[in-house]
Amino acid sequence: MYKRQLVNYGVGLCKYTGSRGKSGASDASAELVAYVRKVLDEADVVWQMAELGKVDAGGGGTVAMFMAERNIDTLDAGVPVLSMHAPFETVSKLDCYMTFKGMKAIYEA
């Protein structure tokens, strides 16, 4: 497992995110991760696991912390982006399609 998302390696999954210690963190259960991996594999979706960033190092803020506050088991997923928030962001067509295909598979499961 790489510590970063790679372009052309499929939809990016992030098991844990956070800041401010445990108060702003989320960590998906092993059962949720296994379920999502199974659904994606059965749908022939290319996926990768990686970190979103170092805790308290800035960046990497998602809505996962708001879900975790309500005790909702949360797994971040999305398109890996190079140079996010820069004038020119770069994404892969394959990653976009695999994210679409993966989300569709999860909703249909």
Question: Which role fits each region the language model picked out?
Answer:
Residues 79-109:
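His/Asp/Glu-rich mid-to-C-terminal helical/loop segments that flank catalytic regions of hydrolases
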Residues 4-88:
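Active-site-adjacent substrate-binding region
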Residues 1:
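Active-site loops and adjacent core secondary-structure elements that bind or stabilize anionic groups
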